[in-house]
Amino acid sequence: MGLSCGNPTALASLEPGEVVLDLGAGGGLDCFIAGPKVGAEGRVIGVDMTPEMLAKARGNLGAYRERSGLDNVEFRLGEIEHLPVPDASIDVVISNCVINLSPDKRQVWREIARVLKPGGRVAVSDLALLKPLPRGVLDDLEALVGCIAGAETVDEVRANALDAGLTDLRMTAKPQYVEAMTSWEDPLYKKIAAALPDGDGMSDYVVSLDVAARRG
């Protein structure tokens, strides 16, 4: 249902009755995982900027409702830099390997802070850089679409979250995703690895990063 590099629904520790917003919902997988966790009194809103993915997600709603017995998930067309939800209306924002694709990541974090209720929290899984990639990789369109060339450094992610006014920031770098993609000889990862300096590997540059924080 879409690319993922972590498990933000588990990171978020969702509770019954909460309102959840998924940034870049794709085919809706994380929304459908979140739905039963928040239950009939909760609500899950998935936002995606592509009509094709929105149609796919909405097409999956019937199976979700039949399987779960719940009607608590909806999908909206919109950009994650300009979220189609009111201020202070969301308990939990989640996102799975999407923010790296945004051309204005600082604005995305501002939007996260805007839509969260006071005390609300964010749980994001994304790819991040331990150090800058070579220019040839950064200019590679396939590497951009593959969620690598657009990734920020861990320090840049931290700065964006804090600058947005979020607090209680916790970040955990996990090498397992990149190690798995490398061991599976993923074609994109092989291509990028070949462009790295001698002796360097993908895990020297890229990690899956879990980010959790709150709005004060």
Predicted regions and their residues:
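C-terminal lobe and adjacent flexible extensions of AdoMet/dcAdoMet transferase-like proteins
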Residues: A164-G216
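Conserved SAM-binding loop
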Residues: A57-R58
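A short glycine-rich, Lys/Arg-flanked "PGG" loop and its adjoining helix->strand segment in the class I
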Residues: R106-R121
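Conserved alpha-helix/loop element of class I SAM-dependent methyltransferases that forms part
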Residues: M1-V19, D30-I33, K37
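Short alpha-helix
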Residues: G150-G165
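Conserved SAM-binding strand-loop segment of SAM-dependent methyltransferases
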Residues: E66-E81
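Short, glycine-/aromatic-enriched active-site segment of Class I SAM-dependent methyltransferases
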Residues: A128-I148
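A short acidic, Gly/Pro-enriched loop at the edge of an enzyme's catalytic core
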Residues: P16, E81-V92
